[in-house]
Amino acid sequence: MHIDQRHYDKEPTSKGEKIFIIVISLIFLIMMTMEIITNFEPKKLGALLFIVFWIPLLFIHEFGHALMAKILGWRVQRIVIGFGKILTHTSLLSAPMEIRSIPLEGFVQIAPKTLQLARLKHALIYFAGPGIELLVFFGIMILLGGMDNLFTINNDYTHIALQSFAYAALAGAVLNLIPLGIITKGGSTPNDGMGILICLFSTGMDYELWIREAEKESRF
């Protein structure tokens, strides 16, 4: 399991995988639409908005990682949003960013510049993704007037949208902090929770090798 954050690329989705994802998504959307329009009430939109908000939260999550890396003086080599075919290239925080066709996950490719507090800084960078989602959750809770109002169900559209955004942010943070190793074609890579544990128990040699590799890559 690598100590760096998602230093891999998923291979582009095959035609069969794309068709499967599209069909499943359409079936799910049709079923959800039928449920929403049957005896419609605004509060029924909550579940749909919860899912829709995962996409902007993916941007926010990866921005949290990249921002913390910049603040702590680490290299931000690349930011990737989604997997599959690259739709466009842009930049964020002076780092190249790729927007891909299926925005269900992302990663930030980083590297330390020095060994100073490397393990602690790495743990903070891992935490920054879920951490910024927790900030979103608590910010909305304060905006709505406290925990009771956050969990009060009503038919106000603005309230429903803010609730759904807060719930999605909290769910994303909690899921990312549960220590898991994600199996990929390039090996096993840690999620944020597992990454925090791994980097805290890594050695200085691990980071020294990482710095050397990053310096070699930067020359090309």
Which positions does each model-derived feature cover?
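Small-residue-rich helix-interface/hinge motifs
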Residues: 48-116
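Hydrophobic transmembrane alpha-helical segments that form the core helix bundle
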Residues: 115-215
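Topogenic membrane-insertion module of multi-pass membrane proteins
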Residues: 2-46, 101
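Alpha-helical transmembrane segments of multi-pass membrane proteins
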Residues: 31, 54-58, 168-176
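Membrane-interface elements of multi-pass transporters and channels
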Residues: 40, 67-75, 79, 83, ...
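Helix-boundary and loop/linker segments of multi-pass membrane transporters
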Residues: 38-43, 111-117, 157-158
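Low-complexity, intrinsically disordered extramembrane tails and loops of integral membrane proteins
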Residues: 1-11, 211-220
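Alpha-helical bilayer-embedded segments of polytopic membrane proteins, i.e.
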Residues: 10-31, 55, 124-143
